[in-house]
């Protein structure tokens, strides 16, 4: 864990405070001396597991540093909450119906305009880590991406069109590859825009092998709705809606004063 934290600190010290939205990226590119841009994405990462928002579960000092030195959003939304379509929205600045990528089975149309293409004349652009758009990246001078969802252990990457299997844990590898590009492979005459996209903590939520027992003796309180069973709820809702029609019929036939209207549930489940 400490090994990864040290590397994360090193990445954060390359020259970025925070890059959190496309308008900010556009303003960076339009400056007389453009700023470096590092866009870090973690997958299916709930805000409750970032200690800048909630300290109940885990400490995340480097993410907290970004929040403290930059901006923390307390009321934010995504254009699409599905993994790959959300990535397409990020690249294009367009809603899913406009960019053509509506679910995880789609193929991203790389011929359309994206923000890396818009800044590529000024920036050395790269994406490293999870891509998940079922096509080769466009608008990047360098790309080194996981295949599909990617594997947590000994994952296979595609580096500028060439498959490479790397030994180790996906998060560590992605970080190492990013550091190597930043320090030794990019065009240092230009500012950089690096999209560093991690697979973790997407299900199956597998950690580095050294962290497998990190929370072995920890107890986390379950939410009140954890054991809720939603089976049959839709049918119950529709039944409730039909009852309103039955009641309307009773009143329309002027039977309300003459009859008793009774509803019961034999199993008391709803």
Predicted regions and their residues:
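Formylglycine-dependent sulfatase
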Residues: 2, 7-16, 20, 26-270
